[in-house]
Curated annotation (Swiss-Prot):
Keyword RNA-binding: no
Family: Belongs to the TRAFAC class myosin-kinesin ATPase superfamily. Myosin family.
Protein name, per record: Myosin-B/C
Region (Actin-binding): 671-681
Main location: cytoplasm
Subcellular localization(s) per the UniProt record: Cytoplasm
An example Gene Ontology biological process: microtubule-based process
Species annotation: Toxoplasma gondii
Organism taxonomic ancestry: Eukaryota, Sar, Alveolata, Apicomplexa, Conoidasida
């Protein structure tokens, strides 16, 4: 099966038999049918052949469910994530299993997922990434996703946590965990270790390497750390001279690096050695659009003092040809301060003891290279050559200035650039070079001088950090590209990809060794392990005879070799190996290599010249004759015969020699792997491009790692997990008290699966893939037998839940009916006919509606003369509310400028109210009605009198806010500080379960908006105090107990923050706690204890010396159309979807009804300033 999403993977169409298609050609484990052919509806799966992926290919896959009408030849699917209407048909071979009831944040190792197909891997990585969990394990790999922001997870405190943990295996994945594992293995087994960090440009390899070194360097401050400081100081130098801004990464490493460190857990980094390879030399002389050359050039030109500028003949950035690419130069980079970085480089040079004359030589060489690029070489007719090279007088001055900086003879260098010497017998015949030959010579000089300068800096660093007597044991860190696939691939990509093939072979050996040790530890036979490595491919690429490298070297040593002839030779000699194919686009100059991860097309155009890119002996002799010690030392020990190319001097040959030496070292170590992923090209935090990540899963062999774990007994779980996974095979057996190992064995024996397909180990069950699939089929058949029973029990259970719900809310419904009767008294409010017609028709209301309110007479609570039935009230509301909702909202804040004058209110309050007796009777009646009131009679009367005075006039939202302020200040002055006021306009607040630490009073009050609409609102007032010291200690212990229930889960995706006036870290922390406790109390609905736990945690963890008590209000329902106002400095309101309410809700809710949620409000009562 050739899947659609793989046809353009990695930028080209796949052959049907390409290696990477095996990840998609695996038989789908989706088994939505029983043996009788019945489809299992609501079965979850992934597919790429769906509307969402067609609209947005970056999604790659969408989650769907199987619906009725599915057959064994095609599945009827409904898309659920992202949601879409309608159904569509897909072939069963075009779907993947989905992992159900799996919380991605709890899955540290994706290898232990029930399904590890590519869709499930993408889903888990995406879910964790969006929750800022960037590290995931795919043993033996650590997958690290670049977050493009600081998550605060690499601080010294994090290092301390991972260094000092007594059980590091219980910690979540992290580069620090990998570094600690390498360090413990080094000291425990006395065996050399290596950490291989790979990924594409911008994936975070450099940052991961720096964090590993920080972990190793975090030793006791009492130990001398001179060498360690030197190694750490070398990082800015290597970055300045080896990193550059590319289109894909602002700080891209353009070289490979292998560091060997002598590390101790107590003394830090003691010695080290650094090897560099594959420096991108061409970047010195040219860059693509929106890219830069190496950072050091820009740092020098921006950060140099006026004295340095004069000393090194520095010009502006725009005046250098080498720094202005094809479409102009790119001088500035967001997030990079070249001046500040130059100061850091100077400090690092001091630490590396590159001072005085050495530092002068380095800067002189850099300036000289830039000036040589400004030398203009022209062509003219001379000595019978129509395009003979010559240098204009103006450029000769520039060349002379550059040679002065390089401390070489300008006349000798000019001659070697322009004059060609040919030795014929004893005579030397001189002739002119062409314009192109001279330009090539200058470019080659610039590239090689910079390359040798970089090598010299590495040697200087090594001379300071090398162990005098060698390192007995070391940890190696390899920082290198993953497989690289570009639009046009040439020699550079061949070298990078061959390196990765060597590393892939080593990786396969490591996985095989790891699996073998696991089988032996569990007592499982290892005969089932059958691995296929890439040894034959490595031989076809790098073998001594009839290999790519051998043919490349022969072609470069040949006299009349051409790129086209070299391409033909490759196909003629190597195509029989099965790893080299003809290109479908250009058979003359292109060929395809069948790499481990994909078929990659290369071009031979210019490949021979690139391989021969070396400095001619004559030019090298000029550089060796330099009077500057550093310039002279750049080419020491390099001998080339004049006019000839010798074996071992070619780029590929030298690279292969260094590569084999490095791989030989790595092969002798115990390897740890870190794969860095780049989630998007725009470098946006939380940006996810599924197709880009999928490419990297292939290029970094992450899917290959998971595929290798499917060999042999691919399904392996401990006994408890196995029994839980397949419990429906025999529920009674699983629920018994028998030993889990015995239960697991009985389940397998009863299934009828051949014993050759499974093994019971010491602590785990090992099952082959086909047998695991058969178990899934059997379990699904068992579950399908329950469908008729579920169809009967489902409605019965919903009926029971509905009755329980009604029993809990019947009291509130009675109160609601009473309030409805009171508000629906006939003739209590008269609205003009024009206004009523506008409200009913949904038209715009008049700006000044004529509203006549009859004054309500309050006798001794006389019963109303006529009461509308509750059914009529509901019918009226259900018709009018949805129709007038939008229009009514416009009148909420008719007069935002209306305010309440506190002083005027207090003066008015001193007067005796005409309804004084009524207010006292009302307060007394409320206290006797079992209202949630715990204030004294005097306070209750005070509250009701204040409310009655303030609500005499029509209201607006602005006025409600001011009323809160006035009531709070009034209560503070009369009854002490720490009073809080909350106003909510919805009747749902009558159903609220509140927990307040202090005196509480709830007021129901009628109000009328300025447009004539009446409403019922609730006002909660309560008085609290600062907690005492002994209470805070009790709360601290309660907070630790509360927070320690479940530390590893993350509820940031469940808990929605609606309003917040707390720091982000506190918002995340408290949201997590609320989500965790909600999982515990959602079925009991004991919101008082729920609120108590939250309050204890807040007081114990976040109370400040001058703050008050934290208060918590929990309410079933949203604060819909409400104005919640409190006077405090720290405040958090969240909403949580309430599945229990959702299940009990009607299938056809009334229009305008909110989604069932639980609202939690947390705020701190702070003492206001005294007037």
């Amino acid at each position: 099966m050739e899947r659609k999403q793989t046809q353009m993977i990695l930028g080209r169409r796949l052959a049907k038999d390409s290696p990477e298609v095996k990840h998609f050609q695996r038989k789908s484990s989706v088994v939505p049918f029983g043996r009788d052919g019945r489809a299992a509806t609501n079965f979850t799966c992934w597919t790429a052949d769906c509307p969402a992926v067609k609209a947005d290919p970056t999604l790659v896959f969408a989650k769907c469910i199987v619906v009725g009408g599915s057959m064994d030849t095609q599945l009827e699917l409904e898309q659920v994530d992202p949601p879409a209407r309608g159904t569509f048909t897909v072939a069963p071979t075009d779907v993947f299993n989905a992992n159900e009831l799996i919380e991605p944040e709890t899955v540290d190792d994706i290898g232990y997922l029930p399904h590890t197909n590519v869709a499930c891997v993408l889903d888990v990585l995406k879910s964790r990434f969006l929750r800022s969990i960037i590290y995931t394990t795919a043993e033996p790999l650590l997958v690290a996703i670049n977050p493009f922001k600081d998550l605060g997870n690499t601080t010294d405190a994090w290092i301390s946590t991972y260094r000092n943990a007594s059980k590091p295996e219980m910690l979540p994945p992290h580069v620090f965990k990998t570094a600690r594992a390498a360090l413990e293995d080094l000291e425990g087994y006395k065996k050399n270790q290596s950490i291989i960090v790979s990924g594409e440009s911008g994936a975070g390899k450099t940052e991961a390497t720096k964090q590993i070194m920080r972990f190793f360097a975090s030793a006791s401050s009492e130990v001398r750390t001179t060498i360690q400081d030197t190694i750490m100081a070398g990082n800015p130098i290597l970055e300045a001279f080896g990193n550059a801004k590319t289109i894909r990464n602002n700080n891209s490493s353009r070289f490979g690096r292998f560091m060997m460190l002598d590390v101790s857990s107590h003394r830090g980094i003691q010695h080290g050695s650094i090897s560099n390879f594959l420096l991108e030399k061409v970047r010195v002389v040219s860059q693509e659009a929106n890219e830069r050359s190496y950072h050091i050039f820009y740092q020098l030109l921006k950060g140099a003092t006026s004295e340095m500028r004069a000393k090194y003949h520095l010009r502006s950035l725009k005046e250098y040809a080498y720094l202005n690419g094809k479409n102009g130069g790119c001088y500035d980079v967001p997030g990079i301060d070249d001046k500040a970085d130059f100061e850091e480089v100077l400090q690092s040079l001091d630490a590396m003891q590159i001072t005085g004359s050495k530092r002068h030589s380095v800067f002189s060489i850099l300036s000289g290279l830039l000036l040589i690029g400004n030398v203009s070489i022209e062509g003219k007719d001379a000595q019978g050559v129509p395009d003979a090279a010559y240098i204009s007088p103006q450029s000769e001055e520039i060349l002379e200035e550059a040679c002065q900086l390089l401390s070489v003879d300008d006349a000798a260098l000019k001659k070697e650039i322009l004059v060609k010497s040919t030795k014929v017998g004893p005579q030397v015949i001189e002739g002119v070079r062409t314009k192109d030959e001279a330009k090539t010579s200058v470019l080659s000089l610039s590239k090689n001088v910079y390359d040798k300068l970089f090598d010299w800096l590495v040697r200087q660093l090594n001379s300071l950090i090398d162990a005098p007597d060698g390192m007995p044991n070391f940890i190696g860190i390899l920082d290198i590209f993953g497989f690289e696939v570009l639009e046009v691939n040439s020699l550079e990509q061949v070298l990078i990809n061959i390196t990765n093939e060597y590393l892939q072979k080593h990786f396969i050996d490591v996985v095989f060794d790891m699996e073998t040790k696991l089988y032996q530890a569990e007592g499982v036979p290892t005969e089932a392990l059958e691995y296929t490595d890439n040894l034959a491919l490595v031989g076809a690429l790098c073998g001594k005879n009839d290999s790519f490298f051998a043919l490349l070297e022969d072609a470069c040593l040949g006299i009349r070799s051409t790129d086209e002839g070299f391409c033909g030779t490759i196909l003629r000699r190597l195509e029989p190996s099965g790893f080299f194919l003809e290109s479908r686009r250009d058979k003359r100059l292109k060929f395809i290599i069948r790499h481990t991860i994909a078929d990659i097309e290369y071009t031979c155009e210019g490949m021979l010249e690139k391989n021969k890119d070396f400095l001619r002996k004559e030019v090298m002799d000029v550089m060796k004759a330099s009077t500057d010690p550093v310039t002279k030392a750049l080419f020491e020990g390099i001998e080339i015969e004049a006019g000839k190319i010798g074996k071992g001097t070619l780029i590929a040959s030298r690279f292969l020699k260094n590569l084999e030496e490095m791989i030989g070292i790595v092969a002798q170590t115990e390897a740890h792997f870190i794969r860095c992923l780049k989630p998007n090209e725009e470098k946006k935090p939380l940006g996810w491009n599924g197709s880009k990540v999928l490419n990297q899963l292939f290029s970094l062999s992450i899917l290959e790692a998971l595929q290798l774990r499917q060999v042999g007994y691919a399904y392996r779980r401990n006994f408890s997990e196995f029994c839980s996974h397949f419990r429906w095979l025999d529920l009674g057996l699983v629920n018994s008290d028998r030993d889990r190992k015995e239960v697991a064995q009985l389940l397998l024996e009863q299934s009828g699966i051949p014993e050759s397909s499974w093994v019971i180990g010491k602590t785990m069950v090992f099952v082959k893939p086909d047998a695991a699939k058969e178990l899934s089929i059997l379990q699904r058949e068992k579950l399908m037998c329950f469908q008729p029973l579920i169809a009967v029990l489902g409605p019965m259970w919903r009926k029971v839940l509905l009755r329980k719900k009604m029993a809990r809310v019947i009291h509130f419904l009675t109160r609601l009916e009473s309030n409805a009767r009171r508000h629906l008294e006939p003739d209590s409010i008269n609205i003009s006919p024009e206004e009523r017609e506008a409200l009913l028709s949904g038209m715009e209301r008049p700006r000044n509606p004529c509203v006549v309110v009859k004054k309500r007479v309050e006798p001794e609570r006389a019963p109303p003369t006529k009461v509308l039935s509750l059914s009529r009230a509901r019918l009226s509301l259900s018709k009018e509310l949805p129709r007038n909702y939008a229009a009514s909202n416009e009148a909420l804040d008719v007069d935002d400028t209306m305010s309440v004058d506190t002083d005027a209110f207090l003066r008015l309050k001193m007067k005796r109210s005409p309804n004084e007796n009524y207010l006292r009777q009302t307060a007394l009646a409320r206290l006797k009605e079992r209202r949630p009131s715990h204030v004294c009679m005097e306070e209750a009367y005070h509250v009701w009198r204040s409310v009655e005075l303030l609500f005499r006039e029509p209201l607006s939202d602005k006025r409600l806010q001011n009323i809160c302020t006035v009531i709070r200040n009034d209560m503070d002055q009369h009854y002490g500080f720490f009073w809080q006021v909350i106003i909510n306009r919805t009747p749902n607040f009558g159903m609220a379960a509140t927990h307040i630490h202090g005196s509480l009073h709830v007021v129901e009050q009628e109000g009328m908006y300025r447009d004539g609409r009446q409403f019922l609102f609730h006002l909660i007032m309560y008085k609290t105090r600062k907690p005492r010291k002994e209470e805070i200690r009790l709360h601290e212990r309660a907070a630790e107990k509360t927070y320690g229930i479940c530390r590893k889960r993350d509820f940031s995706g469940i808990v929605r923050v609606m309003n917040s006036k707390v720091p982000p870290y506190m918002q995340k922390d408290v949201s997590y706690l609320i989500g965790m406790l909600f999982q515990r109390y959602q079925y009991t609905r004991d919101w008082t204890n729920f609120a108590t736990c939250i309050q204890s945690y807040l007081i114990g963890r976040y109370s400040e010396p001058f703050g008050g008590a934290w208060n918590v209000v929990a309410q079933e329902g949203a604060f819909f159309l409400s104005r919640l106002w409190t006077k405090h400095s720290r405040f958090l309101r969240v909403e949580i979807d309430f599945p229990a309410l959702a299940e009990q809700a009607s299938s056809e809710p009334c229009p305008g009804c909110p989604t069932p949620v639980l609202t939690v409000v947390c705020f701190e009562a702070c003492a206001p300033d005294r007037p």
